[in-house]
């Protein structure tokens, strides 16, 4: 998916990152329409792009594969009715609180990230932002992306962020005991 006038692209993950030139069968069918925010030329000659996800999509059909993959997609729209439910609100609140705890307890994450998390107003943006920045396998991130609805995505995000927080606490506890010995 590409729209040159709006600098948007379709982003999908590969099932196996070792495949150099993936075919349509080597890609997950769920992806994200993303806006290109910045294109960076790296010192090693490679190019990196900074993107912001806008909405989810599902690949329906291959249109062409040269010079790049071109596909027909179906946009996946959020059901905003769920966002008003109290369980959903509490789940989002828990995600935000746990993300802030991880930031505060992990010396490798800049403290400004806590400010950024606290100031995200959109529930779906928070869930997507936290999910994309967690240290998860591509397969686990794909599970979150492929969830049927925003409530299910929020619960999966909370499950994974709680596991990440438990690992961080255990790691910090081990390092503290080693220092004290």
Where are these regions (language model features)?
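N-terminal low-complexity, acidic/polar interaction/targeting segments
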Residues: 1-181
């Amino acid at each position: 998916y590409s729209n040159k006038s709006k600098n948007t692209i379709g982003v999908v993950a590969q099932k196996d990152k070792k495949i150099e030139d993936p075919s349509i069968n080597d890609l997950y069918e769920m992806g994200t329409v993303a806006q290109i925010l910045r294109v960076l030329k790296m010192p090693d000659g490679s190019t990196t792009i900074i993107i912001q996800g806008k909405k989810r999509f599902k690949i329906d059909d291959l249109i062409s594969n040269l010079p790049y993959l071109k596909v027909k997609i179906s946009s996946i729209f959020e059901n905003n009715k769920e966002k008003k439910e109290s369980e959903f609100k509490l789940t989002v609140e828990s995600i935000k609180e746990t993300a802030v705890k991880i930031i505060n307890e992990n010396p490798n994450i800049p403290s400004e990230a806590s400010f950024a998390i606290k100031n995200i107003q959109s529930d779906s943006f928070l869930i997507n932002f936290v999910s994309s920045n967690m240290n998860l396998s591509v397969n686990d991130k794909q599970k979150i992306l492929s969830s049927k609805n925003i409530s299910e995505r929020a619960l999966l995000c909370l499950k994974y962020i709680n596991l990440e927080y438990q690992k961080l606490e255990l790691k910090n506890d081990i390092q503290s005991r080693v220092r004290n010995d």
